[in-house]
Amino acid sequence: MQKLFIVLVLFCILRLDAEVDGLTVSLCNQSECQEKCKKENKNGKCIQEIELNWVYNICKCF
């Protein structure tokens, strides 16, 4: 029962991280990033940033 609870808690934490925009540990889809930035008349690129031993994949518009 404890293992199930731990797995459930970890799943909720990871799901919460994936839903937050900005600096989160997530996958960046290049085509979605370009579409998002095209609306701002900019070029989009997936960038990896490292902060406190975490790697963040985020979309940047240039």
UniProtKB/Swiss-Prot annotation:
Keywords: Disulfide bond, Ion channel impairing toxin, Neurotoxin, Potassium channel impairing toxin, Secreted, Signal, Toxin. It is found in: Secreted. The keyword Secreted applies. Residues 1-18 form the signal peptide. One of its GO terms (cellular component) is extracellular region. Expressed by the venom gland. May block potassium channels. Has the structural arrangement of an alpha-helix connected to antiparallel beta-sheets by disulfide bonds (CS-alpha/beta). Belongs to the short scorpion toxin superfamily. Potassium channel inhibitor family. Alpha-KTx 23 subfamily. This is Potassium channel toxin alpha-KTx Tx790.
